From Swiss-Prot:
E.C. numbers: 3.1.3.48
Name of the protein described by the UniProt record: Protein phosphatase EYA4
Organism field: Takifugu rubripes
Coiled coil feature spans: none
Upper lineage: Eukaryota, Metazoa, Chordata, Craniata, Vertebrata
Manner of cofactor binding, per the entry note: Binds 1 Mg(2+) ion per subunit.
Function of the protein: Tyrosine phosphatase that specifically dephosphorylates 'Tyr-142' of histone H2AX (H2AXY142ph). 'Tyr-142' phosphorylation of histone H2AX plays a central role in DNA repair and acts as a mark that distinguishes between apoptotic and repair responses to genotoxic stress. Promotes efficient DNA repair by dephosphorylating H2AX, promoting the recruitment of DNA repair complexes containing MDC1. Its function as histone phosphatase probably explains its role in transcription regulation during organogenesis. May be involved in development of the eye.
Principal subcellular localisation of the protein: cytoplasm
Family statement: Belongs to the HAD-like hydrolase superfamily. EYA family.
Keywords: Activator, Chromatin regulator, Cytoplasm, Developmental protein, DNA damage, DNA repair, Hydrolase, Magnesium, Nucleus, Protein phosphatase, Transcription, Transcription regulation
Length: 119
């Protein structure tokens, strides 16, 4: 019961801030985060901008969704998604952590949910 409440609260926070992580951080941390993001963009030849554009195109299609499978634990993975401003293209229901159950189980759940005719 306590765990279910925790995950409901996490989902609520994720949904609230998926398009505005700066609102979660506060002004001082927001400015530092924006500066860090700008530095990462400069050092990676705008990798994040290009990735976000590609993922946005996919999520805008009516018959497509983005799914994320990670070996990071779920809560830190959600935090990373928000910090990279990817919350808008990855609904929380489509983020799977393989930490405890393994990648195979994650992909079985995805196939069970979306079917076998996926790319």
């Amino acid at each position: 019961r306590k765990l279910a409440f925790r995950y409901r609260r996490v989902k609520e926070l994720y949904t609230t801030y998926k398009n505005n992580v700066g609102g979660l951080l506060g002004p001082a941390k927001r400015d530092a985060w924006l500066q860090l993001r700008a530095e990462v963009e400069a050092l990676t030849d705008s990798w994040l901008t290009h990735a976000l554009k590609s993922l946005s195109i996919i999520s805008s299609r009516s018959n497509c969704v983005n799914v994320l499978v990670t070996t990071t634990q779920l809560i830190p993975a959600l935090a990373k998604v928000l910090l990279y401003s990817l919350g808008a293209v990855f609904p929380i229901e489509n983020i799977y952590s393989a930490t405890k159950i393994g990648k195979e189980s994650c992909f079985e759940r995805i196939v069970s949910r979306f079917g076998t005719n996926i790319t």
